[in-house]
Amino acid sequence: MKSGIYLGKNSIEIRETDIPTVGDNDVLIKNIYSSICGTDVAVYNHGPNTGHKIDVDGEFGHETVSKVVRIGKNVKDFFVGERVYPYPRFVKKDTRRAGTIGGFS
């Protein structure tokens, strides 16, 4: 899959990356549309030390309209083909994983 990789101030590169493995409690989504927000612009223009959790060499971007393409065997709230708008800082019932969705680093 293609991913926008943040390389530092004023530098992003599109790279081919592996499709993530789907665990029993995971949902894999495919981006249909993405947007650029104020956080993206601030980090791009001013570098990673802007108070936002964006890592150099990490996947960049977090506002998407997506489609569910695979679900883990324990997932009951989503179905393959469903369109979703993922909120990158929330993972139902498991806040340790918040921020991992969509590569929001």
Please annotate each region the language model reported.
Residues 1-2:
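Extreme N-terminal starter segment of soluble prokaryotic enzymes
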Residues 39-45:
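Cytochrome P450 core scaffold surrounding the K-helix E-X-X-R motif
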Residues 101-105:
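Short peripheral tails and domain-boundary helices/loops at the edges of structured domains
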Residues 5-7, 45:
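Residue-level signal for short segments within beta-strands and strand-turn junctions
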Residues 10-11, 49:
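Short beta->alpha connector loops
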Residues 11-15, 38-39:
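Short N-terminal binding/cap micro-motifs at the start of the first secondary-structure element
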